[in-house]
Design a protein with these regions (language model features):
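Solvent-exposed loop/turn and edge beta-strand elements of beta-rich ligand-binding domains
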Residues: 1-228
Length: 228
């Protein structure tokens, strides 16, 4: 299995049960054909008659057999044994399958609010960035959290919109989180301290977003239920 955004090398996943020594395959060519779920040929491994090893040929030569599926994918490997002398025996083929399971990462954002007079119903806005790309915008009330799922591996930055929450001082308005196969579930914790005089309008009246302690599925962009 791999994580979304990572890759796998098909050459390392296709294994032959037979051992060829050049004698036991002196009169047959053996070919392993790898196809994707749509039936398209991804690559072939051919052991010529009389040889103890073969060579790979990939449909995308530059890939070298490396694939990065965005969802769980099953591949079919067809082993075909073809006699080099015609009219003696017919070719024989047998199929086998293997699956590359694609897992996804998650990112939990939590907001804590401190200070005298802090209003737990105030809302705070966070932009989740991957490089220069906006992944999603999250709205949280104080002392709440939300989890974004369906994320690929990579470096993310959670940035608070301090122009919106101008009456609160964040400990750090930006948190960097690296998601990987080793660390697939990241977390960004941001604490805000209420200033002496604070005022904050509900962002729900301005943009059609959500406030919830809920899961947000990045793959579907479905807002939370709005329940705590």
């Amino acid at each position: 299995s791999i994580y979304l955004g990572d890759s796998a090398n098909l050459q390392e996943l296709v294994h032959q049960n037979a051992t060829f020594d050049g004698t036991n395959n002196a009169f047959v060519d053996v070919t392993y054909t790898v196809k994707d779920e749509n039936g398209g040929t991804v690559g072939t491994y051919t052991v010529p008659a009389g040889s103890s090893s073969g060579t790979w040929a990939w449909s995308d030569a530059a890939s070298g057999g490396t694939v990065a599926p965005e969802q769980t994918t099953t591949y079919t490997v067809t082993c075909t044994v073809s006699p080099t002398q015609s009219g003696t025996y017919e070719s024989v083929s047998k199929d086998a399958t293997f699956t590359i399971t694609v897992n996804t990462c998650s990112l939990t954002i939590s907001k804590a609010v401190t200070g005298d007079g802090a209003n737990p119903n105030q809302t705070f806005v966070f932009n989740v960035m991957k490089g220069d790309d906006l992944v999603t915008t999250v709205v949280l009330k104080g002392n709440m959290s939300t989890t974004i799922t369906g994320l690929a591996v990579g470096d993310y930055t959670v940035v608070e919109d301090t122009n919106w929450s101008w009456s609160y001082t964040p400990d750090n308005g930006s948190k960097a989180v690296m998601l990987s196969s080793i660390n697939p579930n990241g977390e960004a914790k941001i604490t805000n301290t209420a200033k002496e005089n604070h005022w904050l309008t509900s962002i729900v009246d301005v943009i059609n977003k959500w406030t919830a302690k809920d899961n947000i599925d990045k793959t579907g962009h479905v807002p939370g239920s709005g329940t705590n």
